[in-house]
């Protein structure tokens, strides 16, 4: 049995940059040999790339952690460390990537070979050759590599279909798909025979072609999770035209018009935008007894409940089993599709701003101060912590440079305002030092 997985939660971590090197030339008349330490290489980024050969997120069922390699350390003679290769992660077309914490959409991957850098590799640390000045011609300062970005992501696959088949279970959606395309969905005389979306390519006699998806049957309450619930409703979101398949024979004992209203209510409840998509009503099983009578009653109820200014949906009587009325239905579907533009899947409020991922907002304070129960002052904040991890704490000159950076950020002044005294302990991460007033 083939497995279909359309959601996955994964972790990605880009590689850290390589550390810069402290090294000196050994030449006469050059103080301490002169600085000669090179920069570290850039860490590898994690890149998502669309592979049209993939159809599900099954590859992420057991492999949920993706980590790019770190850049090489800087070398002597001023040579740079080699940058790490990017980690390419293949995804099926139609994958939406969300931030698992905020739920915001990061990117929507639909085109073959489309790429998106989802976690950027860290910058390589600078070697001591970069810190030489007339006042300090032989610095013992080098930076550690910048950490790579690390994120928790939610992947959602929404299949790329132009036309979606919706309706109650066992109304004939799978049979319809199987006779108008080369798809071979599982067909049976019981509810929820279709438990995964099936995709087929339809080609009309006039030469038009489009992708059609048969989605698992909906029942009342699907938008709240009843039956297969919202598990597959997401796949309708990419469609431009909906074929609403209805069993006109009423073989299950339900009223066809009630079925029509119920399914539309579920679509509207799940996502109001789904009702913007044009629908064609497919009156199936017209070869069965009572179907003609039921269709006449259906049309009467539909007309009575439609506003005179609204366009009535087209109705096509067919029999998938007897192959009746299919050509006209497919031609009308192709024509409607040609006159329907793609719908915007997400608005600006759904999308995550780039600023939230890379760089710092200059208007935000670069650090925060709290105090632990043991009276230790604790400093934290993205910008401050980035400076800290890139500082080589094994070299006195690097520590002094870090202290100057803290002072320039206003840390000393802020600690005094909070009541810090000379000799108080200050902690950044796992590094502690005394506050000197």
Curated annotation (Swiss-Prot):
Assembly and binders: Monomer.
Membership in a protein family: Belongs to the TRAFAC class OBG-HflX-like GTPase superfamily. OBG GTPase family.
Pfam families (UniProt xref): DUF1967, GTP1_OBG, MMR_HSR1
Binding positions for GTP per the UniProt entry: 167-174, 192-196, 214-217, 284-287, 319-321
Keywords: Cytoplasm, GTP-binding, Hydrolase, Magnesium, Metal-binding, Nucleotide-binding
Segments forming domain Obg: 2-160
Organism listed in the record: Streptococcus agalactiae serotype V (strain ATCC BAA-611 / 2603 V/R)
Alphabetical list of HAMAP family matching this protein: GTPase_Obg (MF_01454)
KW Hydrolase (keyword) present: yes
Residues that, per the record, bind Mg(2+): 174, 194
GO molecular function: GTP binding; GTPase activity; magnesium ion binding
GO BP terms in the entry: ribosome biogenesis
Domain spans labelled OCT: 359-437
Physiological role: An essential GTPase which binds GTP, GDP and possibly (p)ppGpp with moderate affinity, with high nucleotide exchange rates and a fairly low GTP hydrolysis rate. Plays a role in control of the cell cycle, stress response, ribosome biogenesis and in those bacteria that undergo differentiation, in morphogenesis control.
PANTHER family, sorted: DEVELOPMENTALLY REGULATED GTP-BINDING PROTEIN-RELATED, MITOCHONDRIAL RIBOSOME-ASSOCIATED GTPASE 2
Main enzyme class: hydrolase
Cofactor: Mg(2+)
GO cellular-component term (any): cytoplasm
Localisation: Cytoplasm
Name of the protein this chain belongs to: GTPase Obg
EC number: 3.6.5.-
Keyword Membrane among UniProt keywords: no
Domain OBG-type G: 161-338
